[in-house]
Amino acid sequence: MNEREVNEFLYKGADDLWAYDLWEKHENLHWLPREVPMKDDVYDWNSRLSEGDRMFLKGVMSFFTQADIEVHNTYIHEYLPYANTLGVSQMLTGFAARECIHVMGYAYGLEELVKGAEQDSVFRKWMVDDNLLKLHEALNKYKGSEDTEYRFKHMVATTLFGEGVMLFAQFAMLLNYARNGYMRGLGQIVSWSIRDEDYHVYGVTQLMKRDVMFRVHPQS
């Protein structure tokens, strides 16, 4: 190795170069919600969607806004204490920061589509809808455990289920609107979110496969 290669090897993290590379690729895909024009979505919302469609989209965007706040918090407060290499720390903090973009994206959609006093009630919908509330409680149940090993294993399983199976199922339903010529701005936000979540699920899966984070006790 030449001097530059040695320095890169050291600052990227000798043990977890894959995580540094994943972080860099993920950062190259950075985006902001306000890059997406919503004018046509507003027209669709007011003139083309049924009341049932609007109710469905309100529920999904309300839950996604809150759920991604909690995903961000999970990366910061639950995962990072286990990360003891620079590459893994960078990857996880990058994932957490992108979840804030997702929060902003769904909130931006709601702000553009729902106006007046109704907006606040929609943002709080997940707190009063029985199905959304039960899902919220189920995804956070492990956080009440004092058993560190149980907490860690369920944290990983919940992340892979929440960021993988559950999110992608709802993404498919949302993208169906754009596929049929409706809500294309929202569809763009969802498409970029899917691209991000591919990296997030892959990164967490690699942490498990490579035994990086199966150190039951967090770093002090």
Predicted segments — roles?
Residues M1-S220:
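Non-heme di-metal
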